[in-house]
Amino acid sequence: MASQLLVPGRRRTARHQHVRGQLLGAHHGLLRIEAGDLHWLLPAGHVAWIPPLLPHALIGAEAFDGWSLYVRADAGLDLPPLPRIFQPDALLQAAVTRALRWPHQALDAAQARLAGVIADEIRASTPLPFALPQPRDRRLWRIAAALARSPDDLRSVQAWAAASGLSSRSLA
């Protein structure tokens, strides 16, 4: 199953999961993927792999234009068990472009072969260091969440410390 994604502005999906793995690509904009204790940034021109059954949320701070393909978990494809962001090569881009035109029905033999190529490209991809660990301390987490919502917030260390109940020395 494939779909185009057009998000006109700020948007956040509720935390959810898919029975299928999700391959998510960005043409324009920036998307943040929250999964567990990590957040991944998906910039334009890159692709995210989200394994099946991984609870996640998608957050867009601006207009986003991209696409999504879903990969059956039972396909025996031995795909990566952890999320990753990577830069697609020309082969993956061409295969995805074709797959996005497929009707929502069972794959024929040629489509199944191309889906296998897409799976090969996911397996062969090199993860990029776009994962951001999230703090476990509730006070630090509130600061990180506020900065994620408004990255242009220019509060000083002292102001953040006062707002979170930490000393500025602890925060620095």
Label each residue range with its predicted role.
Residues 18, 37, 53, 113, ...:
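Short beta->alpha linker loops
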